[in-house]
Amino acid sequence: MEHTYTVALAGNPNVGKSTVFNRLTGLRQHTGNWPGKTVERAEGYFSQAGQRFRLVDLPGTYSLAADSPEEEVAGAFLQSGQADAVIVVVDASCLRRGLILALQLRQQTQRLVLCVNLMDEAARRGVTPQTERLGQLLDVPVVATAARSGKGLAELRRE
């Protein structure tokens, strides 16, 4: 039996984590446009190149220091060592806020991928994140996505 890798999906509230989760797993996790929408973790599976992955959608958190029950759930899972990799989803329009969590996780996980989501909305606001440069600075793979339309998710699956 092949090994199933566990991938945590982390990020600030309201950055599209559940939309990314739904697109990758094919499930229908309820999504909403308000912080605190996901209050417990959800799990789903997907396969890529013959490998099976368990994707864990965590509640939104701003850092590993918990200030709410939702952040406690996310922080406990992220610090438990259960994840083989972490995808940190950030809002393309508000990178600074999301990078705090990404930098904290970068220090404690060997496999981190930064998913710069909501690229379509950022473009409408005239914001164009330098994703290639960001990847060089952080020394992690960076994937630009617009999860609602599915743009960039094939590349995210490969990472």
What are these regions, as identified by a protein language model?
Residues G16-K17, R148-E159:
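Conserved GTPase G-domain signal focused on the G5
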Residues A66-V73:
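Glycine-rich, highly charged phosphate/nucleotide-binding loops
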Residues V39, V143-T145:
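Hydrophobic residues at beta-strand termini and immediately following loops
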Residues M1-A66, S80-G81, A85:
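Conserved G1/Walker A P-loop phosphate-binding module
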Residues G36, G60-S63, A92-R96, L118-A123, ...:
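Conserved nucleotide-binding/hydrolysis micro-motifs of P-loop NTPases
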Residues G44-G50, V73-V143:
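Conserved C-terminal guanine-recognition region of P-loop GTPase G domains, centered on the G4
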